[in-house]
Swiss-Prot record:
Protein name: Uncharacterized protein CTHT_0071780
GO cellular component: nucleus
Motif (Nuclear localization signal): 434-441
Subcellular location per the Swiss-Prot or TrEMBL entry: Nucleus
Record key words, sorted: Nucleus
């Protein structure tokens, strides 16, 4: 069922105050996300939003409760230049919560504006009291600030005393590419980087003015996985290996542009890294690190960039169209272009869903399949004045999109499909895009080709399967010509015609004409076809010719009294039969279509054809090569596969009562000529030679390969259909033989070998795939179900037909032994897991101790001289004791032995010598046997 999203009508979260107008234009709203972090934990996105309003204040809203968390007033002359950055910090040692809210403010004229960073530090004590402090720092820069963000907290403390502070930095990026780093607590400048860091590695003219278009903070692991496909070895500037749960420094991605550069080098992608803790300690200086720079081949009109670093997807708006780029090894490639009418803002929901906004509507598109998933109209209100929604944030856990529309902060609920389970179902599939596609605008230069194609050549060849008059008449004429050749018994010409129809070349035979002229009774030699190297090289042909060829090569003999029939082969030596098998056309549906008039009244015709077709192929080619090709190249069901498996097991001699496969001549009417002794002798010699060839082919491995192909395809069939086919085509004892074959596959693949067993070093066999054990176990389960409960209860009767009674009695004991070996393997795996876990825990403790020693933290190491595992020493038992009256008397041997036995634990082994009883021996060594 296709997934259907529903966009609810937006509701107002809060009415925003009207911003004061700037000196250079109207006032604006700036919004930023709020993050929370606990000491020692990871930074997480909160369900809050920070909104900065020019000349008014900075508000923090709780989206779920629709309430104002806090607000910070600013002067009417203050104008914000970029979205605010807010961090909620909670230390581990106290219940005090601190909010750090940073804003970039410009006051005065736009040319001579004073640019400063303000920190609103709000500390909420455990008693509920709130303390707010405001700190300002002027930034000496001629270019406006376009982005600010906070770095991750550091583990070592160098600048600020105390243990309950985040110890983070505030990173500032200006429009011309300058980068500043301020202390997160005091706003003191720590370091500054000029725009040359961004421009010196650009291939174009570095003297051109640089403009920062987009900045996003991320981590090194996300950059390595998303932009470079997991190749973190590109980051050789670090001494440690990047890992998501280990060393994962802060990165930020910058997109820059140059106004005077050509279109090919107009924009560049910069991947920058903040200095790590180790490098800051070793070098004594902190600076930004340029990791990667490459031209960004995007359209010049692109704006409103959104980058999902983890998936490596970059989206932007270009000429009312949503363009999507995918990164591969740091290079962006155009993935798709989605034309959206009236597009003004968008928000990425997932890889397959994008929420777009127009003046009067909201829509959810699938950019991969270019389909419209959902749409909703926007009702105009007084405060919106016809404004479209400007998306600012998305809460994936609640499926809420937050936007600013006019002077209101609105929330849009995107309801999931009703058939979705608790976990988010994979949406954006092709089935969700059917009948929801949008028009594709193709450029004129892409439609035109350098070579002009005339109208007469368009659709000059008939489409396969077309019912147009020229194609139908042409097919009828060729079919009548082929029927005439068969009626005249001209098999050679018929084969040549079919080779032409199926587009298979014929090998030239230069000696054929000479043999026809010299031989008194010329033997008709069929043409030899040139088979392609792979099945994919076969040309696509009209299905009507496939059905026609099956109808002529095979025959159907109906039996009216039993309402069944029998499939026969009329042309066993024809190359058309080999073509049908090798090209994969000999499916049950095609055979049924070829004899649709004959099998109309036959019951269960699919099962009948599926059972008889492999038998006919085995009769035509007793070497089973044709059957193996049929298994590997055709889409088969359970009936065909089970019948083929039975034939292969019979050919390998695994069935004791398996009858001899009939020869090819059993289905052909051969006239036996009596009275000619030499002809009988020749027939016997031919039969002996045929049996010798069959015996030689038994040694080949293609039958075993065919058995493996059949097993793998049978495991993909439905279990219920497989069990029905096994019950219909296999006897109970034959099912047991199949079980033994599957058990042999388990042993051959090494699934019954213990993990701790020593393997021969000279053995170089490849390890079996992990899915083979699941395949074999699934087939064994189906075989057990095929025998049934009543069959297993009468197992002694079924097994009585085996070779010896000992085999019959040991059948279940062997199964029990194999299960025991499997259980022992599980226990060994658990043991190995415990050993590895102990080693891993020791490594973690050693690494933690090494880190503590590097910090100068004192450690207490307990040293004790211990005996090997399982050994311990006991103190000497005194040979004297003191009575109640104070008299000292000697202990008896009985008392000494009693005290020794009391010291021993349960199930312990201890040897008591005569010297111990006499008290002459010292401390003894006892071996525990717990």
């Amino acid at each position: 069922m296709a997934a259907k999203l529903q966009i609810h009508a937006p509701y107002v979260l809060h009415a925003l105050p009207r911003p004061l107008d700037r000196s250079d234009g109207l006032g604006r709203y700036f919004s930023g996300e709020v993050f929370g972090q606990k000491q020692g934990g990871k930074r997480k996105k909160r369900t809050e939003l920070a909104v900065a309003i020019d000349g008014v204040a900075v508000y923090l809203y709780d989206i779920l409760s629709s309430q104002v968390v806090t607000s910070y007033l600013v002067s009417p002359q203050s104008c914000f230049t970029c979205p605010p950055s807010s961090l909620r910090w909670r230390p581990a040692s106290s219940k005090t919560v601190t909010r750090y809210t940073y804003v970039s403010v410009a006051t005065g004229d736009s040319v001579l504006a004073k640019r400063e960073i303000r920190l609103f530090r709000e500390e909420t004590l455990s008693t509920g009291n709130t303390v707010v402090a405001c700190i300002s720092r002027t930034i000496c820069s001629d270019s406006p600030i376009v982005h600010i963000f906070t770095s991750s907290p550091r583990n070592f403390l160098t600048n600020v005393p105390g243990k309950d502070i985040p110890n983070h930095d505030l990173i500032i990026i200006t429009a011309n590419g300058s980068i500043f780093a301020l202390n997160g607590e005091t706003l003191e400048e720590k370091w500054q980087v000029s725009p040359s860091v961004l421009s010196r590695e650009i291939l174009s003219d570095s003297k051109l003015a640089l403009q920062v278009d987009f900045v996003q903070q991320t981590s090194a692991a996300d950059v390595a996985d998303g932009l470079f496909g997991g190749k973190n070895d590109l980051f050789g500037v670090f001494q440690e290996r990047i890992h998501r749960d280990g060393f994962n420094p802060d990165f930020f991605v910058v997109i820059t542009s140059q106004s005077g550069a050509d279109s090919a080098n107009a924009r560049h992608l910069h991947v920058l890294a903040l200095p790590s803790e180790r490098e800051a300690r070793q070098t004594g200086k902190e600076n930004v690190i340029s990791v990667f720079v490459a031209p960004l081949a995007v359209e010049e009109t692109c704006r409103s960039f959104q980058l999902d670093v983890r998936s490596g997807t970059l989206q932007a708006i270009s000429n009312k169209a949503l363009v999507t780029y995918q990164f591969a090894n740091g290079i962006a490639k155009l993935e798709n272009r989605l034309q959206v009418p009236g597009l003004s803002s968008y928000l990425r929901l997932s890889k397959t869903s994008v929420l777009t906004s127009a003046t009067d509507s909201l829509s959810v598109y699938n950019p991969i399949y270019r389909s419209l998933q959902a749409a909703a109209r926007l009702e105009p209100t007084d405060d919106t004045n016809g404004h479209a929604c400007e998306f600012v944030s998305y809460l994936a856990s609640r499926e809420l999109a937050v936007a600013i529309r006019g002077g209101s902060l609105v929330v849009i609920q995107i309801e999931a499909p009703k058939n979705r389970t608790a976990k988010r179902r994979a949406e954006g599939l092709l089935t969700d895009a059917i009948r929801r596609g949008i028009s594709r605008k193709i450029a004129f230069e892409k439609r035109t080709k350098p070579e002009h194609v005339s109208d007469s050549t368009i659709l000059a060849d008939a489409v396969p399967g077309s019912l147009s008059d020229p194609s139908w008449s042409e097919w009828q004429n060729k079919a009548m010509q082929a029927d005439e050749l068969l009626q005249n018994n001209d098999i050679q010409s018929w084969e040549e015609l079919m080779a032409e129809v199926f587009k298979v070349p014929i090998k030239p035979d230069e000696t054929a004409d000479a043999e026809k002229q010299t031989a008194p009774n010329p033997v008709v030699k069929l043409p030899e076809w040139e088979w392609p190297s792979s099945r994919s090289d076969y040309a696509r042909v009209d299905r009507r010719w496939v059905v026609y060829a099956i109808n002529k090569v095979f025959g159907w003999e109906g039996q009216l009294e039993s309402n069944t029939g029998r499939l026969t082969c009329r042309l066993p030596e024809s190359s058309v039969l080999i073509y049908l098998v090798d090209a994969g056309h000999l499916s049950t549906s095609n055979v049924k279509s070829a004899f649709k008039d004959d099998v109309r009244e036959v019951d269960k015709v699919e099962e009948l054809i599926g059972e008889q077709l492999p038998i006919i192929l085995a009769e035509v080619d007793p070497t089973m090569e044709l059957l193996v090709g049929y298994l590997s190249g055709t889409q088969l069901g359970s009936s065909e596969l089970v019948s083929s498996i039975k034939l292969l097991l019979c050919s390998l001699g695994l069935f004791e009562d398996g009858s001899r496969l009939p020869a090819v001549g059993d289905n052909t009417h051969i006239e036996q000529v009596t009275g000619q002794e030499n002809e009988v002798v020749n027939m016997e010699l031919d039969r002996a030679e045929e049996e010798l060839q069959i015996t030689e082919h038994y040694l080949d491995e293609h039958r075993t390969r065919g058995l493996g192909i059949a097993f793998s395809k049978l495991a993909a069939c439905p279990a219920a259909e497989t069990v029905k086919s096994l019950r219909r085509l296999f006897k109970p004892d034959e099912v047991l033989v199949l079980l033994n074959v599957l058990r042999a596959e388990l042993i051959k693949d090494g699934w019954t070998t213990r993990y701790l067993d020593k393997i021969n070093a000279d053995q170089e066999d490849d390890a079996p795939p992990d899915a083979s054990i699941q395949l074999i176990a699934d087939l064994m389960s189906r075989c057990i179900d095929a025998v049934g409960l009543s069959g297993w209860m009468a197992a002694d009767v079924m097994l009585s037909s085996s070779r010896t009674h000992q085999d019959s009695a040991n059948f279940f004991s062997q199964f029990q032994a194999e299960i025991s070996v499997a259980l022992e393997g599980v226990m060994e795996a658990v043991r190995l897991k415990g050993v590895i876990a102990e080693a891993a825990n020791y490594a973690k403790r050693a690494r933690r101790a090494l880190a503590d020693s590097a910090k100068g933290k004192a450690m207490t190491v307990h040293m004790s001289a211990e005996l090997p595992l399982g050994l311990k020493t006991d103190n000497k038992i005194s040979t004297e004791r003191v009575r109640s009256g104070g008299e000292i008397v000697a202990r008896s041997s009985r008392q000494i032995g009693h005290f020794i036995s009391k010291r021993r634990g349960i199930y312990s082994i201890h040897r008591i010598s005569e010297e111990m009883l006499l008290g002459a021996a010292g401390p003894t060594v006892v071996q525990e046997a717990r």
